[in-house]
């Protein structure tokens, strides 16, 4: 009798589960970044900035109910500007997430970060040039403080994207700056590995493919800008912002699956 009951239960259970809908994910995302995140050089950054298009990309994917976001990208900023101790831009990031959380209390909290472009400059931006070890220390300080305030939040760290080796506007980047930028990649990987030991399942390596992609497609997807060392390429145009958003979106989507 017991065996017969178990057999009937096993046969019926898949149909019962099939009828149950898994709840879709709602996200609160705060984007941390510089002019690229902000949408500089775009005609309509409110509609075209990478964070806006990342949200649009995510909302087209299965399993996503709603994405609420705040764009905290600010032109010219470095990891130094976002350090908690500076009490300048870090409080704004924290307040942005608190506002999203107050309005959408059941949503998953996620910080999407792409910093490093201005850190890598030879001169100009605050704290530049930032060495690779110092970059690690700065990003860790930002994450640690945010993690204290939002213990369940997820963190997705994207590689800062490529720029042309003659980039020189108000800040000087050039070849040495680009090499410094690329030295940050291993630091991000090290950070993720370290957090995996202490806070497993919270800090993830985000997009790693955009730098190589834009190095190949910069003529079509970056705005040409006149600089002190000729025409340089630093900021994505509308098409480039869409491509970057897709890279970010895929990385974030993989994390929440």
Regions inferred by a protein language model and the residue ranges of each:
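Bacterial Sec-dependent N-terminal signal peptides
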Residues: 1-24
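Structural recognition of the beta-strand scaffold that forms the well-ordered cores
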Residues: 28-33, 37, 68-73, 109-115, ...
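Surface-exposed cleft-lining segments at the edges of enzyme active sites
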Residues: 40, 79-83, 118-135, 173-177
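Serine-esterase "nucleophile elbow" of acetyl-processing enzymes
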Residues: 19-73, 102-103
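Histidine-centered active-site loop/cap adjacent to the catalytic His
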Residues: 225-257
């Amino acid at each position: 009798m017991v065996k017969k009951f178990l057999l009937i239960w096993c046969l019926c259970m898949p149909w019962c589960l099939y009828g149950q809908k898994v709840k879709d994910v709602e996200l609160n995302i705060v984007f941390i970044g510089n002019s690229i995140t902000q949408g500089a050089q775009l005609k309509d950054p409110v509609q075209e900035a990478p964070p806006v298009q990342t949200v649009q990309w995510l909302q087209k994917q299965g399993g996503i109910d709603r994405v609420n976001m705040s764009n905290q990208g600010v032109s010219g900023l470095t990891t130094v500007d976002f350090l908690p101790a500076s009490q300048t831009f870090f409080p704004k990031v924290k307040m942005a997430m608190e506002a999203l959380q107050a309005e959408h209390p059941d949503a998953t909290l996620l910080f999407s970060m792409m910093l490093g472009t201005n850190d890598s400059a030879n001169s100009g931006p605050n704290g530049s040039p930032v060495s690779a070890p110092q970059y690690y220390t700065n990003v860790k300080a930002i994450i640690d403080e945010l993690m204290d305030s939002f213990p369940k939040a997820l963190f997705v760290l994207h590689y800062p994207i490529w720029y042309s080796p003659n980039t020189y506007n108000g800040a000087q980047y050039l070849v040495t700056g680009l090499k410094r930028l690329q030295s940050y990649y291993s630091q991000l990987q090290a950070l993720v590995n370290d957090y995996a030991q202490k806070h497993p399942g919270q800090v993830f390596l985000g997009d790693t493919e955009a730098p190589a992609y834009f190095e190949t497609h910069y003529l079509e997807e970056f705005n040409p800008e006149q600089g002190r060392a000729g025409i340089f390429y630093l900021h994505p145009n509308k098409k480039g912002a869409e491509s970057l958003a897709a890279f970010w979106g895929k990385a974030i989507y993989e994390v929440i699956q």
